[in-house]
Amino acid sequence: MSPRILIVGGSMGGLFAAVLLSRAGFDVTVTERSEHGLEGRGAGLVAQREVFDILREVGIEHVARVGVTAHERIYLDRSDRIIQTQRTPQTQLSWDVLFRTFRDLVPDARYRIKARALAVHEDPVGARVQYTDGHEETADLVIGADGIGSIVREAVSGAQSKPSYVGYATWRGLVPETQVPHLAQRQLFERFAFYEAPGSHILGYLVPGADGSTELGRRRYNWVWYRRYTPEELHGILLDIDGTHRPFSLAPGHLRPELAQTLREEAAERLPASFAAAVAAEPRPFIHAIFDYAPAHMVRGRVALMGDAAFVARPHTAMGVAKAAGDAFALREALLRHPDLDRALAAYQAERVPVGQAIVAYGQRLGRGLLLDRA
């Protein structure tokens, strides 16, 4: 009888694990805290080797062809003049298409939304997940794929083991391309654009539309603006429109209107005109604070972590989805190679902890190479 596996977290990493493990013969259920699912929340992603590997493994390599290619990289100065060009094409795949494709591979009966985990407890021969609605579920193995604010992580590393804020955050916008002013379209479209200044770094590129479309007029422009903030400044920004403090991010529509207006004004003051226009075109900007987290363990008893629940790397690496795919592969192989669950989890941890630590360190090196440590 195959072990019963409960995956807490139904985003990309949880889906990768669910598909690989269920196809390997394991009894897998996914629980996801969101009320309506996660469709439409992603932008573009740079597909690393592990992403192509999992697409090939599952037989859906066609998903890798749904993307928008930036034909060159450009670097702007404050006057909006191109000061450097690199002929390095890069394709941004559709997060939404990738998510929907993997979500469709998990039966609805095995993917339950509106299930918010409250705590995870070890049992003598497994683990037990307690949910906010009062019900509990037990499994032979619980996998925490619940992201940066992981509840499952506490069962592995303790309540005091939390990601560390690195001193800056990313403002983001995802604008239908037809709503971007022509000035910005002429300068930015079909390119991967950058502008750096002390304490500030912005980049932008086209990504597929929410439906995965790559047709002209149906794509979106994705901009990402890194800004330095003290912990006190960040705390004030992360008070959402209802006055609730969010520890890591604010989703679109949750930013207070006066802060959105301030962001547009600061963009006009500090950014090249094309980027300032792109920022102003986003009616619902959102923000993610940036954190590091690199523990020595990702397993305790019958509880294992993966993805951002296990290690949090800075987004400069563009390896978040690839890291989750690598974790899913390693976990499946360990469980197939070692019938004993404890030995399997020990093997999984031994393989993936060094990888996670290396990716976090890589993100830290990339962060030091920017101007974000200079206000």
Can you name each region flagged by the protein language model?
Residues M1-I5, S22, G40, V46-T178:
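Conserved N-terminal helical subregion
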Residues I7-R23, D27-T29, I143-G144, W171, ...:
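Conserved mid-domain beta->alpha element of the FAD-binding
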Residues G13, H36, G149:
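Conserved Rossmann-like nucleotide-cofactor binding loop
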Residues V30-S34:
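Conserved acidic E/D residue at the C-terminus of a beta-strand in Rossmann-like folds
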Residues T85-T88, S94, F99, V180-A278:
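Conserved FAD/dinucleotide-binding core of flavoprotein oxidoreductases
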Residues K114-A119, V129-H135, A268-A281, F286:
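Flavin (primarily FAD) cofactor-binding/catalytic cores of flavoenzymes
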Residues S150, T170, H201-L203, A310-F311:
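Histidine-centered metal-chelating micro-motifs
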Residues G369-A375:
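C-terminal domain-closing interface element
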